Amino acid sequence: LIVEKGSIGNSFKHWPLSTKTITPSFTTNGFGMPDMNAIAKDTSPAFTFNEEHLSGKRYAEYLSLVATHYNLNVKTNTNVSRVTYIDGIYHVSTDYGVYTADYIFIATGDYSFPYHPFSYGLHYSEIQTFTQLKGDAFTIIGGNESSFDAAINLSQTGARISIYTSKTGLKKEDADPSIR
């Protein structure tokens, strides 16, 4: 069972319009190597859409196609209100009832709980297009993928960009920003 608070791929549908997958999709399945953006064996977003870097809307469409093809049990527009662990079983309370499971995987994503420490400024998830932002100088707080995506897109409008962060991966052994 997959419980989704919105539609399938909801957070991807809310990416800024200019945002694309960072890792390119390649149809390497025939060579025994999966497409890095694929979520199911023998599938490839690159093959499905003939694109190397998919938009969020396109990737959400891929997720929906995979869910349909594999007949996955997805409960959309369903909020989880509580999870309890009783006698070795998880009880997941939703607005449509309680589900039980031996294991649960929490995949809430950045868009579900955006970190907004200030009463001013915009979170990356609030931007639809970078061209809508007025000004010629922007300050970006943060140093991971969204920050650099914003910086690149804003610089293409001719704006001056400053990025401030307390953490970078430049001297880290592991480049995965999710563990910093």
Annotate each language-model stretch with its function.
Residues 3, 7-60, 168-170, 174-177:
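Glycine-rich active-site loop/strand segments that organize a redox cofactor
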Residues 9, 21, 83, 113-114, ...:
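Flexible, glycine-rich phosphate/dinucleotide-binding loops
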Residues 11-13, 85, 115-117, 150-151, ...:
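Short glycine-/acidic-enriched loop or helix-start segments at secondary-structure transitions
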Residues 15-19, 89, 118-121, 153-156, ...:
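Short, glycine/charged-enriched secondary-structure capping and boundary segments
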Residues 45-112:
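Feature captures the FAD/FMN-dependent oxidoreductase FAD-binding
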Residues 55-58, 103-157, 162-163:
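Glycine-rich dinucleotide-binding loop and its adjacent helix/turn
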Residues 91-94, 123-129, 179-180:
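A generic local structural motif
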Residues 156-180:
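A Rossmann-like FAD-binding core segment of flavoenzymes
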